[in-house]
Swiss-Prot record:
The keyword Cytoplasm applies. InterPro entries: aa-tRNA-synth_I_cd-bd, aa-tRNA-synth_I_codon-bd_sub2, aa-tRNA-synth_I_CS, aa_tRNA-synth_I_cd-bd_sf, Glu-tRNA-ligase_bac/mito, Glu/Gln-tRNA-synth, Glu/Gln-tRNA-synth_Ib_cat-dom, GluQ/Sye. Its EC number is 6.1.1.17. The gene is gltX. It catalyses: tRNA(Glu) + L-glutamate + ATP = L-glutamyl-tRNA(Glu) + AMP + diphosphate. Its main location: cytoplasm. One of its GO terms (biological process) is glutamyl-tRNA aminoacylation. It is found in: Cytoplasm. This is Glutamate--tRNA ligase. Keywords: Aminoacyl-tRNA synthetase, ATP-binding, Cytoplasm, Ligase, Nucleotide-binding, Protein biosynthesis. Belongs to the class-I aminoacyl-tRNA synthetase family. Glutamate--tRNA ligase type 1 subfamily. Gene3D superfamilies: 1.10.10.350, HUPs. It comes from Aliivibrio fischeri (strain MJ11).
Length: 474
């Protein structure tokens, strides 16, 4: 039997990190087992759904690299199928019409609470029996599933172990509302049955739904999938993860300069482990992932750890991979690569210094765009009269260079130091400020090589003009 998992988000908002981790676990399990992964959009809540949310979910899945084998399926396009199954259950007396109004049910619930009884629907309650008896054909009604009254629902959760719920704790679930809309617990059963889902991996907030769904599977004679319920994700303060803990949308992490490999690596470790290993390639995740190694306990989201991983992936990934995701940030900052070095060479040079792609994009700017002024602090410290002679000599030497290589530029700097009998800092720092506009960069000879001869010459002249003006105004 082919293993088949699914991710089934509701399009009422963005793809948040909890949902992204669930999707990742489902995707990894399917790939580990040589199975298939299905994307299903659970859009039966027509009032709250939005196409914008659907687009955001699909964009987030693509960005994370979780491609699906089937789908996306949309529940809103399957209402005929749901009605067909409702009719089947009605015909087999496994479901029935209920005419009790919301007001009547609220009244009964209040009585139960006043009597310190468990508030639940009871088909045999005299008032409900009377309401059903008084109903006429065509009156508004819901359809309820006839839940077994005896015995228990038992299932082996692949993360939490054996779970048992008495049927006496479960009431007769509404499977179709008065407006004809099917309900969540019903449609997911029909979908998972029709789509051949073998493993349902989802958040622990669905544990209470599982026994209800299992009873519907069994009433339909459908195979019951295996279930695995993941613990929740907490903020670093121990509270449930929310917006106040920082970014919670997958695409917000994209916007803040994270690589998908870094986020995937972080999310897979947020509840799953393989010894002490922290860094996992996608291939390793697929080969090593197992539900038995997923923790039952909640995990705390640590932004500093994610940032550390992001820096690791910026430094260690192939430059072409980083460039693919850097491009979006370059576009946001209106940095065109048309007039400058290959971006992969810039990534090799400055990537190690960057924690995010936002930083990398900003530190790439001076390779492609000229600046009109120097950073005030760096210029005040390093573009002084004492730097005039070293910069003039360096300018003459770089203008005379026939081969524009890092080695030759390094030799120029050493020659200036030797001829003027000055330390490396006396020319290195003024050159750095002149060429980059600021006081921090990788090795200045490597930077100059990538910036290019024409720009380096022009920027040294600009620095000398700045020094001359500064001395004139002193």
């Amino acid at each position: 039997m082919t293993v088949k998992t699914r991710f089934a988000p509701s399009p009422t908002g963005y793809l948040h990190v909890g949902g992204a981790r669930t999707a990742l676990y489902s995707w990894l399990f399917a790939k580990n087992q040589g199975g298939e992964f299905v994307l299903r959009i659970e859009d039966t809540d027509l009032e709250r759904n939005s196409q914008e949310a659907v687009d955001a979910i699909i964009e987030g899945m693509h960005w994370m690299g979780m491609e699906w084998d089937e789908g996306p399926y949309y529940q809103s396009k399957r209402f005929d199928r749901y009605n067909e199954v409702v009719d089947q259950l009605l015909a087999e007396d496994k479901a029935y019409k209920c005419y009790a109004s919301k007001e009547l049910l609220d009244e009964i619930r209040a009585e139960q609470e006043a009597n310190k009884e468990m508030a639940r629907y009871d088909a045999n309650h005299p008032k409900i029996v009377a309401a059903n008896a008084a109903a006429k054909e065509g009156d508004a009604c819901v359809i309820r599933f006839r839940n077994p009254k005896e015995g228990s629902v038992v299932f082996d959760d692949q993360i939490r172990g054996r779970i048992e719920i008495s049927n006496s704790q479960l009431d007769d679930l509404i499977i179709r509302r008065t407006d004809g809309a099917p309900t969540y617990n019903f449609v997911v059963v029909v979908d998972d049955w029709d789509m051949g889902i073998t493993q349902v991996i989802r958040g622990e907030d669905h544990i209470n739904n599982t026994p209800r769904q299992i009873n519907i599977y069994e009433a339909l004679g459908a195979p019951v999938p295996m279930f695995a319920h993941c613990a929740m994700i907490l903020g670093d303060d121990g509270a449930k993860l929310s917006k106040r803990h920082g970014a919670v949308s997958v695409m917000q992490y994209r916007d803040e300069g994270y690589l998908p490999n870094a986020l995937n690596n972080y999310l897979v470790r947020l509840g799953w482990s393989h010894g002490d290993q922290e860094i996992f390639s996608q291939e390793e995740m697929i080969n090593l992932f197992s539900l038995s190694a997923v923790s039952k306990s909640a995990s705390a989201f640590n932004t500093d750890k994610l940032l550390w991983l992001n820096n690791h992936y910026i430094k260690s990934s192939e430059p072409e991979y980083v460039a693919k995701y850097l491009q979006w940030h370059l576009d946001q900052k209106e940095i065109s690569l048309d007039n400058g070095p290959a971006i992969t060479e810039v990534i090799k040079l400055v990537g190690e210094r960057c924690n995010t792609l936002i930083e990398l994009a900003e530190q790439s700017r001076y390779f492609y765009q000229d600046f009109e002024e120097f950073e005030a602090g760096a210029a005040k410290k390093h573009l002084r009269g004492v730097a005039k002679g070293p910069l003039e000599l360096a300018l003459a030497k770089v203008e005379a260079l026939e081969e524009w290589t890092t080695e030759n530029l390094h030799n120029v700097i050493e020659e200036v130091c030797a001829e003027l009998e000055i330390g490396m800092g006396k020319i290195g720092m003024p050159l750095r400020v002149a060429v980059t506009g600021g006081g921090q960069s990788p090795s200045v000879d490597a930077v100059m090589q990538l910036v290019g001869k024409e720009r380096v010459v022009a920027r040294i002249k600009m620095a000398l003009a700045f020094i001359a003006e500064r001395e004139a105004n002193a």
